[in-house]
């Protein structure tokens, strides 16, 4: 979001938390601004701007500090949806945290007041961009630090010119008390402007030329399951190589993911079903053996009791 790009940053009339449809006739890449929303959280202002250019719709998030300093992130609408879901996980985790102990705050002060280790971390990867989300804490409180790194060699929605392979990064810090308000504002923009997202079918640099580009305007919704302390996310995406399923394994301090192409889903599903059936049979056999062992030790006693009852 360059200076002057956003209608809300220019001080346009919608006021705090107001949607502000706007458009731009010319400019670089003929970018059109579709909506803008402003949030005031503690002493910071956050702007969420939905924009569109020839490559599709995308979201720009800007943080404006008390001194006027700005940090900006750029997300495709598909990544924005993943980001919204991740915010839900952080909100849930934050709600379960108790207050910081005096010892923890004192330790933070001894370290110069800087953030302690992350209370929860996740990351998102899409094409040439990576997003790192860390819930941290310092003497001023808890906050979600969001860092974006961009490989300039990959192009994309908001990428400007730069030497191939060169990485740049931007970071914003969202006070934890504003997580729900921020998530709800983001969800509203996605609901209103994410339905016709061409990028969902083509990827940040994609078009209609790839194997899946432009052919899959609708994909299955993502889902997740929780097992003990782990959570597994299933997200369907599409890029120039076709449709894929990303399976992410998430623990409080760890995240790993695999990507399964659409043509292998049937084989993966068959393998899972086969192993589930085999394990069910193994468990049943073990249970039967356990019952037999228990019955063998007490069977005689049960029979004698039955005979005594008959004699009575």
Curated annotation (Swiss-Prot):
It is found in: Nucleus. GO terms for cellular component: nucleoplasm; nucleus. The modification Phosphothreonine is found at residue 31. Its main location: nucleus. Expressed in myocardium of heart failure patients. The modification Omega-N-methylarginine is found at residues 24, 152, 294. GO terms for biological process: negative regulation of transcription by RNA polymerase II; positive regulation of transcription by RNA polymerase II; regulation of myeloid cell differentiation; regulation of transcription by RNA polymerase II. The modification Phosphoserine is found at residues 6, 8, 101, 298, 304. SMART domains: PUR. Pfam families: PurA. The modification N-acetylalanine is found at residue 2. Defects in PURB may be a cause of progression of myelodysplastic syndrome (MDS) towards acute myelogenous leukemia (AML). MDS refers to a heterogeneous group of closely related hematopoietic disorders. All are characterized by a cellular marrow with impaired morphology and maturation (dysmyelopoiesis) and peripheral blood cytopenias, resulting from ineffective blood cell production. Some patients with MDS develop acute myelogenous leukemia (AML), a malignant disease in which hematopoietic precursors are arrested in an early stage of development. This is Transcriptional regulator protein Pur-beta. It comes from Homo sapiens. The gene is PURB.
């Amino acid at each position: 979001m360059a200076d002057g790009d956003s209608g809300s940053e220019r001080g346009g009339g919608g006021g705090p938390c107001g949607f502000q449809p706007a458009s731009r006739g010319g400019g670089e890449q003929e970018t059109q601004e579709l909506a803008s929303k402003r949030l005031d959280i503690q002493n910071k202002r956050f702007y969420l701007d939905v924009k569109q250019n020839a490559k599709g719709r995308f979201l720009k998030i800007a943080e404006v500090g008390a001194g006027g300093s700005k940090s900006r992130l750029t997300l495709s609408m598909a990544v924005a949806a993943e980001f919204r879901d991740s915010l839900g996980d952080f909100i849930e985790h934050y709600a379960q945290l108790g207050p910081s102990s005096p010892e923890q705050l004192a330790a933070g002060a001894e370290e110069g007041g800087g953030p302690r280790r992350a209370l929860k971390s996740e990351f998102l990867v899409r094409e040439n961009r990576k997003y790192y989300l860390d819930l941290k804490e310092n003497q001023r409180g808890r906050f979600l630090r969001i860092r974006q790194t961009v490989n300039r060699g990959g192009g994309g929605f908001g990428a400007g010119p730069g030497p191939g392979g060169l990485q740049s990064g931007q970071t914003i810090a969202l006070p934890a008390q504003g997580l729900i308000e921020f998530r709800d504002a983001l969800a509203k923009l996605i609901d209103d402007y994410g339905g016709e997202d061409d990028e969902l079918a083509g990827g940040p640099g994609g078009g209609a030329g790839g194997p899946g580009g432009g052919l899959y305007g609708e994909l299955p919704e993502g889902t997740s399951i929780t097992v003990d302390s782990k959570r597994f996310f299933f997200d369907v995406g599409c890029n120039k190589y076709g449709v894929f399923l990303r399976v992410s394994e998430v623990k409080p301090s760890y995240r790993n993911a695999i990507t399964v192409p659409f043509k292998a889903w049937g084989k993966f599903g068959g393998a899972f079903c086969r192993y589930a059936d085999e394990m069910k049979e193994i468990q049943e056999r073990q249970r039967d053996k356990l019952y037999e062992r228990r019955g063998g030790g007490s069977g005689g006693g049960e029979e004698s009791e039955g005979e005594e009852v008959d004699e009575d």
